[in-house]
Swiss-Prot record:
Protein's name in the database: Methionine import ATP-binding protein MetN 2
GO terms assigned for molecular function: ABC-type D-methionine transporter activity; ATP binding; ATP hydrolysis activity
PROSITE patterns named among the record's database cross-references: ABC_TRANSPORTER_1, ABC_TRANSPORTER_2, METN
Domain ABC transporter: 39-278
Gene: metN2
Principal EC category: translocase
Length: 394
């Protein structure tokens, strides 16, 4: 219910009030942005009053979103993601710090200023919140109708948007006949009616099945490319970040704990919260393989014919594809691939290879965990990968 009120309130607040005329235009010119990032947060804090006292939802958040990029904000439930997004569209005011959208200080705006801002800031909500008694066309046209836009212009604009989101054939359908993905496409079209410069997405795919999620993310990416639109989306799913975002910020207990290009954050996560979120994408060894891997002996030599199991990881820092042949040649002897794979994120190849390698006979010392051939093998692996560690032997 709260999201429904937010949706309707946002639609009404983003409409130019009928009869405002030249005053509204003049005020919009007064808040026209000049240069800089599309979205900027400077040491932003947000405190709410609770029966138990003050509760900090956000603490000292500093972020910059470049114009034209897709910026993802991810965190667990209650981390502060939705509060942050509500600050960007003026549904909440910061308790401290400064929020700028298109160069405009959101916290300093009066109601007229917020109207002008929201015309340039579209909003896609988690729940579709469509009016059941209105058709697809009427739902998308509603903000324009409230704004007093002439009918002919409304028709032109809405039909173009329905074509953009792939719903031209559903123009006269009612929400009850639509799938979840189609309903969200209506929500996206509605968010674009005022030609916004920034699109805010609040868990826009969390109510959808995986296949539909991918289609909506593909639509957002297409809109970003076609319109040059800056998109800020919040999610709790790393798959969403990987699929569509250029940059990601990880938020934990109201603080931004890590930020960077998606390929870097995925390939080399530096904070525990990031690693925890990524754990759902990083599969453990298959049970059958894990049962075969034995821990290295502390003192005794390895059994004859044993191979060292290495976990080799590529973070994408080199930019090119890993030279697996060079790795195998450096390790020497018999090298077997046991598990893993390589994928490309933003043109950076990264992934994990679990391999079994035979220590070379010319490496000095016994093949134990304390040095000798195992240490030499590990050192050679590290020369050809970003990270490598010994898991045991088979």
């Amino acid at each position: 219910m709260t999201q429904l009120f937010d949706t309707l309130g946002f639609i009404e607040a983003s409409a130019v009030r009928a009869g405002a005329g030249a005053d509204a235009v003049a005020h919009e010119e007064a808040v026209t942005p000049v240069g800089g990032a599309a979205v900027s947060l400077e040491q932003v804090g947000k405190v709410f009053a609770t029966p138990r006292g003050q509760a900090a939802a956000l603490r000292d958040v500093t972020l910059d979103v470049r114009r034209g990029e897709v910026f993802g904000i991810i965190g667990r439930s209650g981390a502060g993601k939705s509060t942050l997004l509500r600050l960007l569209n003026g549904l909440e005011r910061p308790s401290s710090g400064r929020v700028r959208v298109q160069g405009v200080d959101v916290g300093a705006l009066d109601e007229d200023g917020l109207v002008a801002l929201r015309r340039r800031t579209g909003m896609v909500f988690q729940h579709f919140n469509l009016l059941s008694a209105k058709t697809v066309f009427e739902n998308v046209a509603l903000p324009l109708k409230i704004a007093g836009v002439p009918k002919a212009e409304r028709v032109r604009k809405v039909e173009a948007l329905l074509e953009l989101v792939g719903l031209a054939a559903k123009r006269d359908a009612y929400p009850a006949s639509l799938s979840g993905g189609q309903k969200q496409r209506v929500g996206i079209a509605r968010a674009l009616v005022h030609d916004p410069e920034v699109l805010l997405c609040d868990e826009a795919t969390s109510a959808l099945d995986p296949e539909t999620t991918q289609s909506i993310l593909a639509l957002l990416a297409d809109i970003n490319r076609r319109l040059g639109l800056t998109i800020v989306l919040i999610t709790h799913e790393m798959e969403v970040i990987r699929a569509v975002c250029d940059t990601v910020a990880v938020i934990e207990q109201g603080e931004v704990v890590e930020t960077g290009p998606v390929w870097r954050v995925f390939g080399d996560p530096r904070h525990g919260a990031t690693r925890a979120l990524l754990s759902t994408l990083q599969h453990d060894l298959p049970a059958e393989l894990a049962a075969r891997v034995r821990p290295l002996p502390e003192q005794a030599a390895l059994p004859d014919g044993a191979q060292i199991v290495l976990d080799v990881r590529y973070t994408g820092e080199s930019g090119g594809e890993p030279d697996v042949g060079a790795l195998a040649a450096a390790l020497g002897g018999s090298v077997r691939f046991l598990h893993g794979g390589i994928e490309s994120i933003q043109g950076h190849a990264q992934g994990r290879l679990v391999i079994a390698a035979t220590p070379r006979a010319d490496d000095a010392g016994p093949s134990t965990a304390r040095g000798g051939a195992v240490a030499a093998l590990l050192e050679r692996a590290r020369r050809h990968a970003n990270h490598a560690e010994v898991l045991g032997y088979v």
